From Swiss-Prot:
Membrane-related topology note: Single-pass type I membrane protein
Protein localization: Cell inner membrane
The UniProt record lists the keyword tRNA-binding: no
Compositionally biased tracts (Basic and acidic residues): 70-81, 138-162
InterPro entries xrefs: Cell_div_ZipA, ZipA_FtsZ-bd_C, ZipA_FtsZ-bd_C_sf
Subunit note: Interacts with FtsZ via their C-terminal domains.
Gene from which this protein is expressed: zipA
Annotated organism of origin: Marinobacter nauticus (strain ATCC 700491 / DSM 11845 / VT8) (Marinobacter aquaeolei)
Listed name of the protein: Cell division protein ZipA
CC per GO annotation: cell division site; plasma membrane
Length: 338
């Protein structure tokens, strides 16, 4: 065979290989899209097997993400005997890379760029000067001088804990609130939640082999306007007044799911669960954005990954689907009142 015939044969094989690989990728993408789409349906929340399986990503398999049925079993949500409101159609979702601590520099256009709260300038550690060669005469003199004990050497002061970096809208909303305002005859935070007909869940799971520390979680929650209250979990109200509607709540992903104040200093957990129940907030879409920003704030400051209510990666498409569920719920609420 001539060189030309060899080149034609090789080119034909390369083209066939590219076509076969393209068909294989299309089939795999279609299967994954159907699996994710079927996994986000609101109609199947009651049948979620989420709490029956261990999460292999977490140490000892002890942490499980939280579904609506799990929240109801723990008593965080009141059961509603009426049929849950769900969307009639679900959009196909193309799998993309999820939100994680590595995604801080990327902007998907979903939220405004975060405002970084600059921590106080840390004291730089003292730099020891390089050793200088001295003449023999000076060395002899130094032998007669009393040696300085090592403990007397200057030691760097321990670094102060850096304040958490809070995203823009949550920071501004929390800053508008009156700190340490005295409360009289106000209910416990989260005690006024109505019966939930729709629940949106965002899980934040630590990376394999790592844990979230209770003291850091407490500081971050308080910086984001959350308050420890009913059911020994954290809640965020629309204002510092606990009679206002609850925007969202945060529970421990490990049984029994609580954040008791006396245990926060020594607490460590591989995951936490944010959940927002509908009806509830006056502005449900804004409450969801605050919940999402707070979850992303945990990822930014403490590491970890965002997961949805079925332990799947929280993609931009998943977040947009949650917003669509809120819009559909509000639309059906308006049609029922009409």
């Amino acid at each position: 065979m001539s060189l030309r015939e060899w080149l034609i044969a090789i080119g034909t094989l390369v083209i066939i290989g590219i076509v076969i690989d393209g068909v294989r990728r299309m089939r795999r993408a279609r299967k994954e899209s159907m699996a994710i789409s079927s996994g986000m349906g609101a109609d199947e929340l009651k049948d979620s097997p989420l709490d029956d399986d261990f999460n292999p990503e977490l140490p000892n398999g002890g942490a499980r993400t939280v579904s609506r049925s799990t929240l109801e079993d723990r008593g965080y949500l009141k059961r509603d005997m009426s049929a849950p409101v769900s969307t009639d159609q679900e959009d196909d979702v193309t799998p993309e890379s999820g939100w994680s601590a590595r995604d801080d520099d990327e902007d998907d256009g979903i939220l405004s760029p975060p405002r970084v709260v600059k921590p106080e300038t840390e004291e730089s550690e003292p730099v020891e000067p390089e050793a200088v060669k001295t003449p023999a005469t000076e060395v002899d003199r130094s032998k007669t001088r009393p040696s300085v004990p090592e403990k007397a050497k200057a030691e760097p002061e321990p670094r102060a804990e850096e304040p958490p970096v809070v995203t823009t809208e949550v920071e501004e909303d929390t800053a508008r609130r009156t700190p340490n305002k005295p409360r009289k005859n106000q209910p416990l935070a989260g005690a006024n939640r109505p019966e939930a007909r729709e629940v949106l869940v965002i899980n934040v799971l630590a990376r394999s082999g790592e844990q979230f520390q209770g003291s850091k979680l407490k500081s971050l929650f308080e910086a984001c306007g959350l308050e420890q209250g009913d059911m020994d979990i954290y809640h965020r109200h629309e204002s510092e007044d606990t009679t206002t509607p609850v925007q969202f709540s945060v529970a421990n992903a490990v049984e029994p799911g609580t954040f008791r104040p006396q245990d926060m200093a020594g607490l460590s957990t591989p995951g936490i669960s944010f959940f927002m129940s509908l009806p509830g907030p006056t502005n449900a879409l804004q409450a969801f954005e605050f919940m999402l920003e707070t979850a992303q704030c945990v990822v930014r400051n403490l590491g970890g990954e965002l997961k949805d209510e079925r332990r799947s990666v929280m993609t931009p498409q998943t977040i947009e689907h949650c917003r669509q569920r809120i819009r559909e719920f509000e639309r059906k609420q308006r049609s029922q009142r009409a």
